[in-house]
Amino acid sequence: MTIDRARELDAADPLAHYRDRFALPADTIYLDGNSLGCLPKDTPARIAEVVAEEWGRDLIGSWNTADWIVMPQRIGGKIAPLIGAAPHEVIVCDSVSVNLFKLIAAALQMQPDRKTVLSEPGNFPTDLYMIEGLEKQGLATRRLAERDRILEALDEDVALLLLTHTHYKTGEVFDMAELTRAAHDKGVLVLWDLSHSVGAMPVDLDGCEADFAVGCGYKYLNGGPGAPAFAYVAERHHSALSQPLTGWMGHAKPFEFLDDYAPAPGTDRLLCGTPPILALAALEVGVDLIAEIGVERLFAKSQALSEFFRECLSERGISLELVSPEDPDRRGSHLSFRHENAYALSKALIARGVVGDFRDPDILRLGFAPAYLRFE
């Protein structure tokens, strides 16, 4: 019986007890952690502490006494091992969209003889929109190549290759090492969007010699809706890094209030305005929890969950067209299915307490966030 098998898998699951660290509605099967992660139980208390004590009692002094001022660097350092980076290569700031803008512009400045930014059609819209925005300013030329034509599209005009590591709609994972190496062979820099990878699967930015990366904090890192994003810049690019959003917090000496901008060292120069302390506090709880579990263990469980789900469909005689790769090593932590009535299916599942999501025109996405899902 499938239910017996599910219970056996739960009993043998070394991560099962982590489910108790999250606030989960009793009547809901939540398969949308790839859109918004669940609430860690420690988060409300941490936010209350920041509000009542650090802000309410200690007021402005908490920028120093509670180390608010270094939260972007501290949390970035905690995200770093999750993505195969050194702590000083990662900073938490702004949103994915804003960080994309900064890093695309930075890459173009590093490649003054090249203007083209290459991506693929069907990439997450904000990635494409940020290139388009720079194109309308006369600073870039956008080029799109189908996934199987990317390598041949890398030529002497391309300054930057911008790709999403795990595709938001299909879950397909790019071979980061292969594509980065191929791009570098053509003198092209590479920017990876890790929004659907970070916290769900191992990533090795330094090992793959990536140049730049961005990622969000509200999916598998469970930082809450609108959680701050992060940016990665390989150490070898720190001295040449120049980005256009030169806010006061990215200044080398922000509290000297000088008239002229001088960039802070390394990734600190990616900071713009005052950090959102409450949001950072929530994100840090989620990051700490994912780091405690470990991305290798999380990915192994995610693969087991998704494969068991497919077995259940087969046993029940339910036929859905799988859009995600068959090989679990070639996909992230969500499965995507194509069905002409995908929207209606999504709504019917939600009505029964099974929360997935729909992507236009005909994709049903089901996320298997392993930190809090069980097999049963």
Language model regions located:
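Pyridoxal 5′-phosphate
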Residues: 1-376
